[in-house]
């Protein structure tokens, strides 16, 4: 039988074997200026911030492969955008945010969903027909991939042991 223990922040054991933490969610309140969001126990490489205050702030998705000045707003149909005041750094125990209302409005409540890939270390991957830049955590089945498309049918290496089940 499989025994699972939940410590309120992350799954801690499966079959009584300790597993590393590759994902964690932390709630925080915006201050409208700058602040560090800590307590993850790892450097997040993919951060998804969502306001829970019932407002119209965008979801902010940022990763350490593309860098802090590139975000995707997943509740919008637009392309990736630049904004230096959302996630401003990926830190050893969390991340920091600037003054943008989508990620840090004064008194607004947020959830930060964070995944650990490879600590910001990328490698070139030529497994597909397009060479990609990959930051993979094969143990977690998670990777961040960056490539330049050619507008034709191409394949892209992802650094995982099996085909991805979700693409964002």
What does each model-identified segment do?
Residues 1-9:
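Surface-exposed receptor/substrate recognition regions of extracellular proteins
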Residues 7, 16-168:
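Surface-exposed molecular-recognition determinants
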Residues 12-14:
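A structural motif specific to WD40 beta-propellers
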């Amino acid at each position: 039988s499989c025994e699972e223990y939940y410590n309120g922040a992350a799954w801690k054991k499966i079959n009584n074997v300790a597993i590393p933490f590759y994902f964690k969610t932390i709630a925080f309140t915006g201050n409208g200026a700058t602040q560090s969001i800590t307590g993850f126990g790892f450097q997040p490489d993919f951060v998804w911030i969502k306001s829970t205050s019932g407002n119209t702030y965008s979801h902010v998705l940022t990763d350490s492969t593309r860098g802090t000045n590139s975000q995707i707003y997943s509740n919008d149909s637009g392309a990736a955008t630049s904004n230096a005041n959302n996630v401003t750094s990926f830190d050893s125990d969390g991340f920091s945010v600037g003054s943008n209302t989508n990620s840090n409005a004064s008194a607004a409540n947020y959830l930060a969903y964070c995944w650990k890939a490879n600590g910001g270390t990328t490698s070139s991957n030529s497994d597909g027909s397009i060479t990609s830049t990959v930051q993979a955590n094969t143990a977690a089945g998670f990777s961040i991939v960056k490539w330049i498309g050619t507008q034709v049918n191409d394949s892209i290496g992802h650094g995982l042991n099996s085909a991805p089940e979700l693409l964002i």
